Structures are given as C-alpha cells and as structure tokens.
Amino acid sequence: TERVHKMSKDTLELLRECDSGIKMAVGSIDEVSGHIKDEDLKNLLEKSKEEHSRLGGTIKEQLASLGDDGKDPGIMAKSMSWIKTNVKLGMNDSDRTVAGLMTDGCDMGIKSLTRYLNEYKGADGASRSTARRLIGIEEDLLSGLRPYL
C-alpha cells in the first residue's frame, strides 16, 4: 500500500506539472501572438496552442478523476516570462524575437517535464504517456520555430 500511495502521489504531481506547463505555454503564445507578422509563424503557434489546449483538456479529466483541479504556473515564473517577453519585444518587435522567446520557452518546458518524469518515477503509465505527449508537442514547436530564428 505504500507503493500504491507513492504511485498515486507521483501520478498526481506529474499531471499537475503538465497542467501548469500547458497553462504557461498557452499564456506565452497568447502574449506574443499580437506581435507576429508572418502568417505561417502565426499558424504554427496557433496550431501548437490548439494541441496544448486539447491535451490540457485530457489532463483536466485525469486530474478530476483524482479529485484535483490542477495547478497554475507559479507567479514568479509567469512574472519573469512576462518581463522577458515585453522587454525583448519592446527592444525588437520582430518574428525572429518571437521565435527566440518561444524557443527558450520550449527548451524550458522540455527540460522541466523531463526532470518531472525522472522525479516522479512512481507515476502511472497514463500520466507518464501524457507527459511524453506534451514533450512531443514542445519538440514539434521547437522544430517548427527554427526557420524563424
């Protein structure tokens, strides 16, 4: 039963971190979308936002089944992201700047999610698969952003 408790605790924590990461990603995309000039870049980010949101719905269901309502990104992380985004775009409002900011965000997301996968080893298969799907969405976006850097 100790193992079962650890598994459900790890499952819950991993899903909460995925939920937080999705909210951070969607918020970041919303924040830069008004600064994008290239239609293809706009479409790339919009498609990624839809993928994040769709997976977010699945995560909400998984969390609800565990009696949890999710996790918002930390105020410090959100504030630092907002400041970095607005300062950089204030200095150079270009698609290259947007792509650079989003690339940094993807890198941080992939690194954090991978760390959480390693940390919450007891999480069940479904939640681990969800985290890997989210990493895949981030990796796809990262790859799509490269031509704009």
Regions found by a protein language model. Name each.
Residues V26, G56, K60-L63, K84-V87, ...:
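A structural signal for well-ordered alpha-helices, especially hydrophobic packing surfaces
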